[in-house]
Amino acid sequence: MIRENKGDIAIVKIRRPKVLNAINQDVFDQLREIFTDIRKDPNIKGAVLTGFGTRAFVSGADIGMLAALKTPAEAEAKCTEDKSVVNLIEDLGKPAVCAMNGLAFGGGNELAMACTARLATQGQKVFVAQPEPRLGFIPGAGATQRLPRLVGMENAWTMLRSANPISSTRAKEIGLIQDEVKGDLVEAAIDLLKKIIAGSVSITPIPKGPIPVSSKLPEVDLGSLSRKTDSLLQKAILEGAKTTLAEGLKIESKVFGECLATEDMKIGIDTFLKEGPKASAPFVHK
């Protein structure tokens, strides 16, 4: 992690280039420390969060960290702990702009959604995804709750259940990001942040209450994805929509723990660790 101050703005950069800035426990711990300091520092008016390099903002969570989980209770507790870092950014008391300098998968998108606003490098064909179902589990750092509240239930329903990526252009269309940037992304983020601080730009925050759910949600082609994981994912999304964001996040953590009791989470993680991210896991739907 790198932090530098530019006047009254903190620039926070996640730096793990060999793994496309994937988040491990050390990154979570440093994010907690850095953003706690930012919140307490009266001289800092806001923050920009970005990633090192040009290929990825954050490529997701370190899967080895998840493979070490032994029980549903342990998985739920880990989820709750990780969420506390994401919630810290959301509840910073100061605006934060995410400069999404490359793909934002899994926990990368979840960190971005906790920020006040999001900007992306222009023209990214593969930009944002919640690929967790490909590994046999649901998102665990807020996506099942924040994504529907940010882009609408129909868009989130398809993104979450299909696990397919969307482009930066599509992300702007559905309201996941504020804009695509052709030039210097961090400078554009600083400029937007200054406007938010000055009150000349207003960003609508993610709703904290229940959200409406259409009686007919889009059909989603699951392909070879686990039907067991999908049923748990639907449960987290739909139950969370009926309640507050805070309660929905607790539901997500609990359901993430339930994933650990399935055969398909073990199959998905084993396949990823042995064969890599492009391998299709032989799920048994249990």
Language-model features: locations:
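Crotonase-fold acyl-CoA enzyme core
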Residues: 90-126, 130-219, 223
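Glycine- (often His-adjacent) and acidic-residue-rich active-site loop
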Residues: 51-85, 104, 134-136
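Terminal peptide-recognition signature
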Residues: 12, 16, 30-31, 49, ...
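Amphipathic alpha-helical segments at domain termini/boundaries
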Residues: 1-11, 15, 161-258, 266-286
